């Protein structure tokens, strides 16, 4: 989306007469990107859909809180990240599994998921990513899958670029170690 388009969209979102139509455009424009960001965090298609409903509901109900000093996509990504992390925290509190069961669970769940179109290596990568701490997982996903610049991630996660680079490199090392152990 160009800067001019974004500015126009922000104006439409601010105007009660055009707000609904503008928000529908936001959903069309960013919905798929947000879905895949959420899906990489929560892994399950059904869980991702549930989180996405919360993301869109929160975005709609908090339109007045949107400060136009950042891009719409950055604001939406932040909501998606927070909702995904909240979901994962709630899920962790509900289900306690051993590490061995958890390792089997993610790969098997992904391979059984009709919406997962990856191969066994992709399932193992997701398994390795799932074992990362929340922040490292988030940084890795944003950098690796979304190809975001450190400066964009810094703005999104409200942290320094140096800390992000360290988190990313530690995550890559942990993923590499995971593959060495499971070779």
Region locations from a protein language model:
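N-terminal module of bacterial RNA polymerase sigma factors
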Residues: 1-33, 40, 181
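Internal acidic/polar
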Residues: 2-8, 94-118
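Short amphipathic alpha-helical boundary/capping segments
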Residues: 9-15, 124-132
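Sigma70-family region 2
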Residues: 15, 43, 54-71, 91-92
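Structural recognition of an alpha-helix C-terminal capping motif at a helix-to-coil junction
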Residues: 36, 50-57, 70-82
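Arg/Lys-rich amphipathic alpha helix in sigma70-family domain 2
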Residues: 65-67, 78-98, 118, 170
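DNA-recognition helix of helix-turn-helix
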Residues: 74, 85, 136, 151, ...
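A short pre-motif secondary-structure segment
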Residues: 139-143
């Amino acid at each position: 989306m160009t800067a001019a388009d974004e500015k126009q969209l922000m104006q439409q979102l601010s105007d009660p007469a055009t707000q609904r139509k503008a928000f529908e455009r936001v959903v069309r424009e960013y919905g798929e990107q947000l879905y895949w960001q959420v899906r990489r965090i929560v892994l399950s298609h059904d869980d991702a859909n549930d989180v996405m409903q919360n993301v869109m509901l929160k975005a709609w109900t908090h339109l007045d809180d949107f400060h136009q000093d950042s891009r719409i996509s950055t604001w939406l990504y932040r909501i998606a990240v927070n909702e995904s992390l909240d979901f994962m925290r709630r899920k962790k509190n509900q289900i306690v599994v051993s590490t061995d069961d958890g390792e089997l669970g993610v790969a098997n769940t992904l391979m059984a998921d009709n919406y997962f179109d990856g191969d066994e290596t992709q399932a193992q990568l997701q398994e390795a990513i799932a074992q990362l701490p929340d922040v490292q997982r988030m940084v890795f996903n944003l950098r690796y899958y979304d190809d975001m610049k450190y400066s964009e991630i810094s703005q999104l996660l409200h942290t320094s670029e140096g800390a992000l680079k360290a988190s990313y490199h530690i995550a890559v090392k942990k993923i590499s170690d995971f593959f060495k152990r499971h070779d």
